[in-house]
Amino acid sequence: MDGWSEVLRIPSSVFATDNYNNPTTIVNITSLQFDSVQNFIWCGDSRGYTRSFTGSFATNSLYGNLQLYPYTKFHTSDVNYNNPIKQILSHREGILSLSNNAISFNSRRGLSKLQVTSKTFNNNATTENKFNNLQAMTFNCNSFNDVVVGTDTSMMKFDLNKPNVLSSFDHQGGISLLNNLGKFLTIANSNGSLDIFDPVSNSTMKTFSAHNGFISNLDVRGNYIATCGYSIKPKRYYHNQPAEYIVDPLVNIYDTRIMRAIAPVPFPAGAASVKFHPKLPNIIIIASTSGQMQFVDIFDQTNVYLYQADLAIPTTTTTTINNKPRMSNLEISENGDFLVFNDNCDNMHLWSISPSSKDFVNFPQPVEQPDIIDSNFEIIDIDANVPLSIVGMPYYKELLLSNYPNDLRFVKETAKLPEPIDIELILENETRNNGTKKFFPYDKLKYGPGNVYKPYQSLKDNKENKEISIPKFISERSTTTTTTTKELKADNDGKFIDDSIFQYKFQGKLNKVPNCYSRLQIQYSKFGIKDFDFSYYNKTKECCGLENHTDNSYINSLLQLYRFQSSIYNQVVGSLSKEWLPNDITTIITTNNPEGSSILNELGYLFDMMFKAQSNNVKIYNLSQVLNHHPNAQKLLNNNELLNLNSQQVRDLVIEFNNFLLTTLHQDFQTQFQENFNLTELKYEIEIKGNGTSCPMYDKHQGSMFSLELITPPSNMLNKMSILINNNNNNNNPQYQPEPISSLDNIRRNLNILTYLEYSMNQYKTIPCQQHNHSYPHNLEIQTSIVHLPSVLTINVNLSNPEFKIINNFTQWLVPEFYAVKSKSISGKNGYSFKEIDHPTPNSATQESGKYKYKYELLGYVCEINHQSDIVSGAHNLVAFIKVNNNGGWYLFNDFLVMPIPEEEVFDLQPSWKKPIVIMYQQTNQPSFNYLTTTTTTTTTTTTFSNAGKYDDSILYRDHFAEGIRKGHQLEYELLTRKESPQPGSLVAIDAEFVMLKPEELEIHYDGYKKLIKPKQLSLARISVLRENGIPFIDDYIVHTSDIYDYLTNFSGIEPNDLNLTLSNRENLVTLQTAYRKLWLLLNLGVIFVGHGLYNDFRTINLQVPERQIRDTAVIYYKSDFKRQLSLKFLAYVMLKEKVQSGNHDSIEDANTALLLYKKYQNLYNKEDFESILNYIYSEGQQLRFKVPE
């Protein structure tokens, strides 16, 4: 740090105000700041002005002395005040200036982008009092748009992109300085203490007592914090003596990794300012008010460089407060080459360690200069008297195009015929490919449809016999034609189907991942998600797919596995028969459960919706929201479809979630219904024994767990067990000849998962005894055994990559069925042994029923698919193989792709990209599914909901507001009575309103083309349900505690704070589960829902309603020839002669209008006049442009 010197001083006369009557008036410098983007020094003064200086070398100097030139000056304080500028922050798009009651955001040219005052925010009436007496500001952690502001009473933040919302932090007390680290905010309190604050958890992580008086300066770099300040001088005479402050001779250093102070740096002159060097974080720059500066190494405090600044001595004409020179506002540039500060005569001093440099940042952007118009531009007038040669021509070294010879001919290169292919290559290729002419394999999914010869095909034949079905938008089915190639497969009806996505195996290519395991993406057209052809990916009739454009969608495959386990399905869905609707403020606010639900409840609703959806797709949004708010699931959240995780991290996440799910289901059953969820519970026993009589140590413990962690046996044990299996299988064969053992790979090929299970369920180890080691050293024997197997055995396979490679060598590691034998070992220990059923027969269980007690079969497993190397992030996805039918039908579930798959593909684990993670075996005597249906069926495996009688539907007949019943509330609806109990076929009108939680994600190309990546995320805000006579019986507003991006007031009628539990004027606020349970009960009771645009409503609510229970007026009054659906407002004007939705939307009004339109349709349909009326509606719409006249 040797070589620093003063290179420039700007006198105080530069900062004089533009007042011609008193030109000697001095403006005090209150803040300084180096720019982080361009070569600027920013200066704030006491009159509320911010100005900038830019550096340049003098043109008339031989050595290029640095000069600072004024660039801009503009007023940044509140327009009604001239408050001093307390702090300046550099932003990539401009400059932030802090005054007493305003924050101004200006471009570097001085143009105002934004001015934030107390009137900017629309939170509530108390905001005006909060956003005053501003003291400090900084950017939020890892964000340049969130600005954190500290006042003399609190701390707040706002977004530069949306500055109308002011959020408060949970921090009390006055703030003098603010700064930010990578994850935390550093707060200098007015009482001299230092707080380490976490903005994510909204809490103070650590508080240090830094200085007795106050902190004068604060700086951070890396993991270190440096502070300097003042202490209160002890009172010597009487207690009412005014407080006096003395500067502390130490600079405090704090390490945020260990959250404590380290060795301070002494500075006898009194530290008033401290800064970290930006390039050498171990170097700090300490300055006193008298101008003494030291460069000190905090790890080697003997390494000190001392400098003294030449400060101007104030005179009585400039100040009358202090006649001593005083230094303030020390700042260092981003590249560490310049220092700037000012004295109390308002002179600005610039120091540098590199006199030949003029850059304040490493890579500065060019400074925008004003346009200079050349006033001496001459215009040449050409008329008949002036020759054209006066204009002049440049000198050309080559001939111009206009000077080409007459015999020159131009030949177009593309007009040449291509060179013929060598006949020898064609003959060689035909010989190699058995006569087929194929040079290179063509990947259609990668490169798109090939440019091949198209044979003639008449339009008539194409429509009637050769219709092509490929994955495309539904709106393009009738207009898009596609070439029929060899990759298109014809079905029994003569139609061609592109089945490349359903390809599950490449012949002879084990390392290439087939198409059916690829990561799928939902495409969005201008018609939205409804236009995407989900039916192409799922041609089954009973298995639904799950969408993957939802947070935590990585659990889709695991949820599919549990949904097809009948015992788990019956118990989880059966729990919905009892009502559990917490609505107290402790649940909603304190425990952060605004949905008023649980993992058990949402999983029950989801399972029921997955059954009712049949082959339609389902979202897991409601379950994901509860998961996001669950306190024990914060480490399990993933909202980017595993793009940030490698192979091992994906396995860890899925297995951890599996354990969390089973444990949470058990806890929810005990909390809600005082029941146990023991379908997957394994009971184990731990026995500790000493060494005979010399060590009488003995202990036994018992416990339980809900899943088994699979452990790979040691290599020597695998070797030994393989030999035993060979002997047992071939002792009775006289022609058997033992083969020599050449390698471990050859030995392991006859092992399977049962070997791993026996080793994992019977663990044995020894540890040194610590209680009797005074006599002689000996060991304790610890044996862990599984003593009880559940009816559903869930196995977590969290193995390393080398261990998975061992499994890849097995011919069939998974077994379809096995017997579990409960027996005692030689030592009398209870345990289990397993035997594979090589050739199961119908009477195999009865023949050996005395020996084998439990018979298990494979239900399915969750499999990780590696598309690239294991260490690559974002190249892995999850699928599930599940045995759906009792007759042995296997299906592959890859999000919304559902397809049958052969059994040999399920048990083939030889490809290295295929790794089982969660395996589920179940006992063969599982009960049948108890599905809830709304109609009487002839099968014995379904239950009619209306006849069940055990489901609690009392919520339909009472109010259940959040925070309890509100007395005196004037209801806009009348509750149902038991006499009005909904029956199958009853008409109810419904309408819902929504708010936006997240905006849509767009991909914008350079040419302006926009592609929708993810749609906007909506949340239910209000639901209204009406009787058939138009009288409402449900009108609920849904509580929201998370941030709402847009209330969509013009469409929803929801005003800000309407959904806030503490600030809302609405009395009928309920939790999301309360409203959802009402709709779920109505759905299962078999009512018919009438509404307008019900597809989007039910999709957002996550309710799967059969088509036979929907009467959608948007579909009823739709004529396919026009390809335009009519709005409810226009239909009401034409059909009912009424004007609705004149102001904000009202869900009761909209539901009643849809009900009247449906009744109108019934009357017209019975009179057989509906088609003519529909034509009249569209003709009127064309004349009015489908808009209601004002």
UniProtKB/Swiss-Prot annotation:
Q: What class of enzyme is it?
A: hydrolase
Domain called Exonuclease: residue spans? 988-1158
- Chief subcellular location equals cytoplasm
Q: Name one GO molecular function term.
A: poly(A)-specific ribonuclease activity
**Where does this protein have coiled-coil stretches?**
none
Keyword set, alphabetical order: Cytoplasm, Exonuclease, Hydrolase, Metal-binding, mRNA processing, Nuclease, Repeat, WD repeat
| Compartments (UniProt record) | Cytoplasm
Give all cystine bridges in this chain.
Answer: none
Region: Linker, residue numbers = 364-511
Q: Which InterPro entries match?
A: Exonuclease_RNaseT/DNA_pol3, PAN2, PAN2-PAN3_catalytic_subunit, PAN2_N, PAN2_UCH_dom, Papain-like_cys_pep_sf, RNaseH-like_sf, RNaseH_sf
Name under which the protein is recorded? PAN2-PAN3 deadenylation complex catalytic subunit PAN2
Please report the organism this UniProt entry assigns to the protein. Answer: Candida albicans (strain SC5314 / ATCC MYA-2876)
Q: Name the gene for this chain.
A: PAN2
